[in-house]
Amino acid sequence: MSAVLVVNSGSSSLKYQLIDAKSEEALATGLIERVGEGEGRIRHRGPGGSAEYTLVIPDHTAAFRAMLAAFGTDGSSLVEHPLDAVGHRVVHGGKRFFEPTIVTPLVEANIDDLADLAPLHNPANLDGIRAARQAFPAVPHVAVFDTAFHQTLEPAAYTYAIDAALAEEHRVRRYGFHGTSHKYVSGAVAELLGRPLGELKQIVLHLGNGASACAVDGGRSIDTSMGMTPLEGLVMGTRSGDIDPAVLFHLSRRAGLGIDELDELLNRRSGLLGLTGHGDMRDVRRVAESGDAVARLALDTVAHRLKHYIGAYTALLGGLDALTFTAGVGENDPDLRAAACKGLGVLGIQLDPERNAARSPGARIVSADGSPVTVLVVPTNEELEIARQALQAVAAG
């Protein structure tokens, strides 16, 4: 029985999943935290059950050794499940990578060269790739880029209206993120509706602590809310989303904030956290339900921004067949879905209150019978999408 190992390597973490290449079943999952921070923590779940323990993990190479040891003790030994590929999540592929790519030394060098576009992610992704290639030297390794799905954007969609030569020199343009999720979900919607992907006009809302919207026309991304970085777009847990750039000049002059302080403000101290002191949507909703006006305003701001993108993308698509909510908040917050869809009957979006309120772990339709636009909740599965793309890359050679 062959399998694909999917790896998501963060700066101090290693998340992994072993997926059966034929059944697409998750055979084992795990998370290793606090890599390089002294005593690390391992959580592993496989056929033999679940385990959680601590271990000194100085670097990603040690994290892979710990992962192999966990596989060896839970009944999902990689000897019994030989690997067809190792699929790696890489956040930023710039404009160089538009498809899953078999890792070579040149590919590693290119990922490293793009680190200035994703300084918090690409170096950690590359550490994981190098450690994995050392652990599995005979297995093909495939990089799957979050930005790749958005390489189909037209120049009018990805161009910022600034000095063209300066933008070209410093690689300033819209790249978009969450592409692996948007690709998976848009495909799952077509399957659920029993319609060809190529004929569907879709909007996918990936709503977690990070959040993005994507307009998908016939399976192709034509616009997305995140930009050169994941900061642009929707209101998020700790990120501001769209903001007038002149606000930064104003805060620099009047509050004396430097570049690094402004970066910290917009990426880590804004969004829900900045508005309410809570970065988790569940906490914000709990406080709002107790009568807190500031928390209520934050929820209204989130919904307002969602409506803004739903309307804009419906216009860009020239109509809409399906609106889909996914990721942690999108899948589990019926009140936000209701607020985002309220008043959008003019666009053909009609939510069914009972269907929307019903709790279910699976993919489901939550729009009313007769709604011109089908509204869905579809759980994302980025690991499975990475596994699929890794196998496709290996098969293509």
Curated annotation (Swiss-Prot):
The residues annotated as site (Transition state stabilizer) are H178, R239
- Catalytic activity as recorded in UniProt: acetate + ATP = acetyl phosphate + ADP
Please tell me whether the keyword Transferase is annotated for this protein: yes
- Record localization: Cytoplasm
Enzyme Commission designation: 2.7.2.1
Any one Pfam family match given in the protein's UniProt record, by short name: Acetate_kinase
Q: PROSITE patterns this protein is in?
A: ACETATE_KINASE_1, ACETATE_KINASE_2
Q: Does the keyword Cytoplasm belong to this entry?
A: yes
Annotated catalytic residues: D146
Q: Where does substrate bind?
A: R89
- What are this entry's molecular-function GO terms? acetate kinase activity; ATP binding; magnesium ion binding
Which InterPro entries does the record cross-reference, listed alphabetically?
Ac/propionate_kinase, Aliphatic_acid_kin_short-chain, Aliphatic_acid_kinase_CS, ATPase_NBD
Entry GO CC: cytoplasm
- Which pathway features in its UniProt record? Metabolic intermediate biosynthesis; acetyl-CoA biosynthesis; acetyl-CoA from acetate: step 1/2
Keywords recorded for this protein, A-Z: ATP-binding, Cytoplasm, Kinase, Magnesium, Metal-binding, Nucleotide-binding, Transferase
> What cofactor does this chain's UniProt record say it requires?
Mg(2+); Mn(2+)
Main EC class of this protein?
transferase
Instruction: Quote the cofactor binding remark.
Output: Mg(2+). Can also accept Mn(2+).
The GO biological-process annotations, alphabetized, read as:
acetate metabolic process; acetyl-CoA biosynthetic process
Q: Where does Mg(2+) bind?
A: N8, E382
Q: Which NCBIfam families does its entry note?
A: ackA
Assembly and partners?
Answer: Homodimer.
Main function: Catalyzes the formation of acetyl phosphate from acetate and ATP. Can also catalyze the reverse reaction.
Q: What HAMAP family does the database record attribute to this sequence?
A: Acetate_kinase (MF_00020)
Family the UniProt entry places it in: Belongs to the acetokinase family.
What this protein is called in its record is Acetate kinase
Protein source organism: Leifsonia xyli subsp. xyli (strain CTCB07)
Print the organism lineage: Bacteria, Bacillati, Actinomycetota, Actinomycetes, Micrococcales
